[in-house]
């Protein structure tokens, strides 16, 4: 569920509260799954126990003892350094600059920015049993648990090409494997424009850090393995050639393959509604708000950091393709589907954010229309339906309320001309009927029908 946090401008606690609304793709401990939210949980847990921000705890317990002075926790601070690195990405045969991605809200999952020299201090502490110059930095009891296998990541079987690289398990935040007969502990990661890997061999007291300023780069693992072969005096594998051959094979297999988007598209269809009907805010408690705007008769999608040049292209019926900036034409695009209720109104949209899960459904929010108290006063009074008297009144300055006997008072949200949504009842609407500029009745629009109440 990385799209929930990626580029989200919310607090750390807000992200934490989203977790309960995110559908799991497997039961607890059924299979191994990497989840950035769980690293966030650990960071927040430490904050609650110690009563200090995660950043302060890392400084006190790790940076200061190791003499790490230049590392920071935000790309905002990174850019204040005299020699900060720029991130890049590759598309086809071109290299282009990527803007920094601020991930402060989910910081414990990977917001630390550090040099190779300072990261090497961290790697060497682990390579030396958790000690620095004989002083214990990482408690021995935790050290052993952290580099002990707790769950299989995958089969990790020896392959024909590299039979001496096998096993794949997870410790406490560390991936464990056997590299040519040596016990390897490693963790890598990627964020916009940057790739990294930290590894160490506890039996050999060797630590290796590789940092690359390119997006999703395979160079980190290639360089790590090449250094390992030399430092541990192992037979040298041409890891660069292996990776290049794999890339060429993938390009060969994909050459001439028809884009899946064109294969699945139903031609000759049209959207069911005018463009303006799709505009609005759509909300999911685990993902937040997606905003759809109409820019010169083209729908634009705004979500978290996706704010510019993300447009919706009609695919078929009420399904649209999401077109991202700098996205290659051959890439299969994400789809969003707009949904309507029984009244024929667009009231939701869904998106396949996770391939192994159901599409995420975002409910369309009511857009409140500014209405003065004077305008609201014309709707107040008593209405009758089937012998029942319903009261409409104003609460506070300009909040219209409706009271049905035996039910709680309902707040109404003005959404159109003489039209109100129930704030707490999905699918319920009130529409006032006027004759000669005077309210004569109101229609209750409910999922099971429309009911008229005449004004007394």
Tell me what each language-model feature is:
Residues 17, 47-60, 64, 82, ...:
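Catalytic loop of the DD-peptidase/beta-lactamase superfamily, centered on the K-T-G motif
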Residues 1-36, 43-44, 50-56, 60, ...:
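Active-site-proximal loop and beta-strand segments within enzyme catalytic domains
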Residues 34-39, 116-120:
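Short alpha-helical patches at coil-to-helix transitions and adjacent helical residues
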């Amino acid at each position: 569920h990385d799209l929930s946090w990626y580029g989200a401008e919310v607090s750390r606690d807000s992200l934490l509260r989203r977790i309960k609304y995110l559908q799991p793709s497997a039961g607890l401990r059924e299979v191994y799954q990497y989840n950035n939210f769980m690293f966030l949980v650990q960071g927040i847990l430490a904050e609650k126990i110690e009563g200090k921000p995660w950043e302060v705890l890392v400084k006190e317990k790790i940076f200061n003892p190791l003499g790490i002075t230049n590392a920071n926790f935000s790309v905002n601070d990174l850019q204040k350094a005299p020699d900060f690195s720029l991130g890049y990405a590759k598309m086809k045969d071109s290299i282009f600059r990527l803007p920094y991605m601020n991930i402060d809200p989910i910081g414990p999952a990977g917001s630390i920015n550090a040099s190779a020299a300072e990261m090497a201090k961290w790697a060497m502490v682990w390579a030396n049993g958790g000690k620095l110059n004989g002083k214990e930095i990482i408690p021995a009891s935790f050290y052993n648990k952290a580099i002990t296998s707790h769950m299989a990541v995958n089969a990790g079987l020896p392959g024909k090409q590299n039979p001496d690289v096998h096993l794949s398990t997870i410790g406490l935040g560390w991936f464990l494997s056997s590299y040519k007969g040596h016990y390897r502990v490693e963790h890598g990661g990627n964020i916009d424009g940057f790739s990294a890997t930290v590894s160490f061999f506890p039996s050999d007291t060797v630590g290796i850090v590789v940092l690359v300023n390119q997006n999703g780069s395979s160079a980190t693992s290639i360089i790590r393995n090449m250094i390992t072969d030399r430092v541990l005096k192992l037979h040298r594998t041409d890891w660069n050639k292996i990776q290049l051959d794999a890339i060429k094979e993938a390009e060969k297999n994909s050459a001439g393959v028809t884009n899946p988007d064109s294969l699945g598209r139903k031609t000759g269809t049209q959207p069911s509604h005018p463009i303006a009907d799709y505009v609005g805010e759509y909300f999911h408690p685990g993902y937040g708000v997606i905003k759809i705007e109409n820019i010169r008769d083209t729908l634009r999608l705004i979500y978290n950091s996706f704010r510019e040049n993300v447009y919706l292209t009609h695919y078929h019926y009420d399904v649209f393709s999401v077109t991202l900036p700098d996205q290659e034409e051959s890439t299969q695009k994400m789809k969003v589907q707009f949904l309507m209720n029984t009244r024929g109104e667009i009231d939701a949209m869904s998106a396949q954010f996770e391939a192994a899960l159901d599409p995420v459904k975002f409910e369309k929010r009511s857009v409140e229309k500014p209405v003065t108290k004077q305008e609201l006063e014309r709707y107040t009074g008593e209405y009758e339906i089937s012998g029942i008297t319903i009261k409409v009144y104003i609460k506070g300055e300009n909040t219209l309320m409706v009271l049905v006997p035996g039910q709680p008072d309902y707040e109404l949200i003005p959404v159109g001309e003489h039209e109100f949504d129930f704030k707490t009842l999905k699918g319920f609407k009130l529409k006032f009927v006027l004759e000669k500029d005077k309210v004569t009745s109101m229609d209750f629009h409910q999922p099971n029908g429309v009911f008229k109440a005449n004004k007394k």
